[in-house]
Amino acid sequence: MGSSSFLVLMVSLALVTLVAAEGVKVNIEKPGVCPADNIRCIKSDPPQCHTDQDCQGIRKCCYLHCGFKCVIPVKELEEGGNKDEDVSRPCPEPGWEAKPPGVFSTRCPQK
């Protein structure tokens, strides 16, 4: 085996190791739950994220308003709670709150 064949073999092994390590990435889910999404879509938007790890800070990767986006999560509801009745949760994005299908408000509900 010549030195060039050995070099090609070593580079190939290094690439296979890197690709295998990338595929084993652990997907750690961030705390909180995705906001309720009552929007009906004709066509989905291209995803802005695939996992929570794609999102900065506390944001989670959630399907919201016709596509996967990084959004501020809502706190988990206490046992027996109803997500649709929980008006104390933060807005999915600053200044916006999803209302019943297709209607938006520019402010969050107050307690």
Swiss-Prot record:
Q: Tell me, what's a Pfam family for it?
A: WAP
Q: Where is this region: Disordered?
A: 80-111
**What is this protein's function per UniProt?**
Antibacterial protein. Putative acid-stable proteinase inhibitor.
Where would one find the signal peptide in this protein?
Answer: 1-23
Gene Ontology cellular-component annotations: extracellular region
Encoding gene, per UniProt annotation: WFDC12
Give the molecular function GO annotations.
serine-type endopeptidase inhibitor activity
Q: What is this protein called?
A: WAP four-disulfide core domain protein 12
